[in-house]
């Protein structure tokens, strides 16, 4: 239920059948990601660099979280959720260097410049 895909559709994995995209329109997914980063940072306090790799595109358009009438809003709500996650991580770890990686910069999202140190 946290994977980005249309309701009642099969999951499509990419990159050798191993990758899916988490549905960041879902606040529970956002919380999970932030909690995971928190746990890593608390367990390994010497971490000073994270590479946020966006190799996987949303190839299965749809959300199991959004209502039927809001499916067309997925890209907007996904981006809002992504920004929320980035904002929370940056606020908690301002000293952490975070690199946004997406196709060698070919899919750079300049809207998230405030949250990343490198592209």
What kind of feature is each model-predicted range?
Residues 2-119:
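Active-site neighborhood of glycoside hydrolase catalytic domains
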